[in-house]
Amino acid sequence: NEDLFQYNTKVSVPFVISNKNYGILWDSYSYCRWGNPEDYLQLNRAFKLYDKDGKEGQLTGTYVDKNGQKIVRGEDSIYFEYAMPEASEICNKTDNGGIQNLPKGFALNGSKVVYEGYVEAPTNSFYQFILYYAGYMKIYIDGKLVVPERWRTAWNPNSYKFETPIKKGVKTPIRIEWQPDGDVSYCGLRVAAPRSEAEKNQLSIWSEMSPDMDYYFIAGQNLDEVISGYRTLTGKASLYPKWTLGFWQSRERYQSSKDIEDNMKKFRDLHIPVDNIVQDWNYWKLDSWGSHEFEAARYPNPQAMLDSVHAMNGRFMISVWPKFYDTVKNYKELDSKGWMYHQAIKDDIHDWLGFRGSFYDAYSDGARKMFWRQMDENLYTKYKFGIDAWWMDASEPNVRDCTPMWYRKALSGPTALGTSTEYFNAYSIVNADAIYNGQRSVNPNQRVFLLTRSGFAGEQRYSTATWSGDIATRWEDMRAQMTAGLNYSMAG
């Protein structure tokens, strides 16, 4: 079972490939579910719950802060998966869930939380759970450690699916151990309703909003022919520049042109092969996100920096977001045409640096052309085509972390094509279109290369590579990237 939506560390392409030499491309841009078309249930909707003393109705939640102060209360569900901006009128009117339902006044940082008791299942089954977590988590069911310790940073929680057998009519012990990460943290545990073997062996597809229920069946003699058919439908993959196959040097983050040049020279002095050095975010003035301008105090001569990198036989990639602070000139120019999303401004959302901004509407052809022109005037043509590649960060788009699905759609719409519900998953491809066709329009003899944090069917035609986002620094997350990368690469 899989939910198809875009988020930091999650890329969703509505294409499935079979070892029987066929593929199915689902023609929908919206949030989808593959496998089980029903959403996961809160624990009290799937099971009878009992507290740790055996009383029916709810689990026991025990919260102990770093000073040893304890709160014990009943929990009929474990669903603390999101936060809402305090100034948002629509949030305050329509959604009182998420971390607002944690104990009032309880300090999460340094605390330990345990949810425990018993679940009684309505039928014998292997139950599929989905865990949402930030901080350290362990789960025991029927006395067995079914989820060994996992960790995620609080600003970017993770989901983890697991399956375990539970017998009908038996009070089965459950224990969830959570050590939150930071002052604000998240956790949740839900479960899918059991399905028959026949249902499990069928492909069910659910789409939240599509004008038609269309899909393409792609047959072939082998998997290569299936991928070829997929590319016939969605676009041929562009040829990357040769240097992209070499080693890239990136970090969070180089903070000056001197940093860039010194590190590139050090690699050369040590005879360590490197083909590409990457400038991550915040090369602009602190309050000027979206200006696409190097801060002069730290980057006094960007052209000389680029020339130096090229003289050392290196390439230069730079991060550009579809995000703009509402005080910068580029925001105002886009906004004057109606090409900025306004909900984040209306709700007075400030980012982690303390400034307010939003994302542009890449579904508008005019907005895409203006977005590229702003990049070109401030970065590309301005520096004699010296930028070799573009890192398109947050291209889901991820306007704000850790919000519920309905509010994410409110933040990223309405689009020029229609409601963000219908076009929820396709932002990265139209954003890639802006840069690919923009660069080709001013410099058709140079190959384009884009690194993007999100992807969709057809992304390959814009010479994109996709990375899996801000994963955790844990071995289990590193291992997951291997299968995730193989899985993603099967989509053309």
Predicted regions and their residues:
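Catalytic-domain carbohydrate-binding cleft regions of carbohydrate-active enzymes
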Residues: N1-T60, D65-T94, G98-Y115, Y136, ...
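Aromatic-lined ligand-binding clefts that engage carbohydrates, nucleic acids, or primary amines
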Residues: V119-I139, I174
